[in-house]
Amino acid sequence: KSWAAQTKNWFENIAKKSGGKINFLNEGVSGTDSAFAVARVQDHIIKNKADLVVLEFSVNDLWLEAAIRNKTYEGVIRQIMNNSETAILALFINIKCDDSGVELPSQQKEQQPICDYYQIPFVSWKDEVLAVGSAADFEAFYDAPETVHPNNAGHASIAGFICKKLQGYWDE
């Protein structure tokens, strides 16, 4: 199961306990970046009156020029904030290398300051894993030399950190 599906299960359990229900929409489109998303926000997020958006472009924004990716990432955030009461949680799934072993820069370095400016909480999966383990622990979440697509254990780990973050807000 993907981290999104596992996070949905967590929400369903919380909703049951509180007598509520959730309407889960996974509006992510595989392989797309924030330049594509900025054109979809109105129809896919705001129109559907989402309560929470998990924003994750740490892999696919890499291919955009820096000025464009920063503007479009911020554009997605601004549209959500200006047109709805939707909460935003940013997710940074940091990548280390592509399938040929070439190191890739982390988008967290560019996206986190934008999130900080708008006071958007985030989960940095790699930072969370390394805080409690080692680089070898992080590498175990992949089955191939590329560290872009996590295995099932990786998805479970991502979901666990997201749910931990959300549980903290729920408990407040």
Residue ranges and their predicted role:
Residues 1-28, 40-49:
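Serine-esterase "nucleophile elbow" of acetyl-processing enzymes
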Residues 35-70:
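Oxyanion-hole/transition-state-stabilizing segment in secreted/luminal serine hydrolases
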Residues 94-127:
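Substrate-gating cap/lid alpha-helix
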